[in-house]
Amino acid sequence: FMKLSLIKALYVDGLKKIYNYTEAESIFYFVLNWVEKKNKTDVILGLETLLIDTYRDILINLKNGIPVQYITNETIFYTVPLYVDENVLIPRPETEELVHWVLEEKISKTKILDIGTGSGCIALALKKRLVNTIVDGCDISDQALEIATKNAVNNNLDVTFIKLDILKDTIN
């Protein structure tokens, strides 16, 4: 067991070549919440004893360039919690802007197809807000389709994901 303040200092110092202080601190608190289910408030209140091995292993992975989302297998996209691993790209903030733009346009289409769906982030975020719209996703990768389907089930969203090579196959 080790003091939380020391682990935080190890993270901020250990990640300073990759992230600025604020980003490193945010990553530490994300890891803290993921490992211990504790948040920044718990830290302030002094709940300070943690398992060092887990934090050390995560820090080593971060220093080796593995994104925190791949380590925890979690990310949030447009308020939709998603499972991610190295078989799909981590959704970017710019992609959230795309979803926001589509929603602002108030498109009256009854069907949307997300091509190259990956984790399913776009399709799932749109379906969550456009409940009366049929949203499907396609990808060439079996692993990506498994992850997208898992994310749909975990979020209780009715999105169908199909294997499709957009350069060779026909879309119906």
Regions found by a protein language model. Give the residues of each.
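SAM-dependent Rossmann-like transferase core, predominantly class I methyltransferases
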Residues: 57-130, 135-150, 161-164, 170
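A generic helix-loop boundary/linker signal
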Residues: 1, 21-22, 85, 112
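N-terminal processing/targeting junctions
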Residues: 38, 171-172
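Structured loop/turn residues at beta-strand edges in well-structured enzyme cores
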Residues: 26, 107, 157
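N-terminal auxiliary segments of SAM/dcSAM-dependent transferases
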Residues: 2-70
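Short, flexible coil/linker elements and helix-boundary hinge sites characteristic
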Residues: 46, 104-105, 156
